């Protein structure tokens, strides 16, 4: 599995009670993964970047993830 495939599996495993909870868990996991990727690419401390990403709203998180993942991958994981 790719790292994003593992992320999707983890989010589904965390919340098996309904679509809303799965999406919420996926967004939380996506924020953590996005913080790691952004910290790597910008050369910033992970904890600092995680704080910034966790403060972002859903639309901004998805926009940033789209830049890193690409539209095709985002459609796959958020459909």
From Swiss-Prot:
GO terms for molecular function: toxin activity. Signal peptide: none annotated. It is found in: Secreted. Transmembrane segments: none annotated. Keywords: Antibiotic, Antimicrobial, Secreted, Toxin. GO terms for biological process: defense response to bacterium. It comes from the Eukaryota. One of its GO terms (cellular component) is extracellular region. The keyword Secreted applies. Expressed by the venom gland. Its main location: secreted. Disulfide bonds: none annotated. Insecticidal and antimicrobial peptide. Has insecticidal activity against larvae of flesh fly S.carnaria. Has antibacterial activity against Gram-positive bacterium B.subtilis B-501 (MIC=0.63 uM) and Gram-negative bacterium E.coli DH5alpha (MIC=2.5 uM). Belongs to the cationic peptide 06 (cytoinsectotoxin) family. The mature peptide may form alpha-helices which disrupt target cell membranes. This is Cytoinsectotoxin-3.
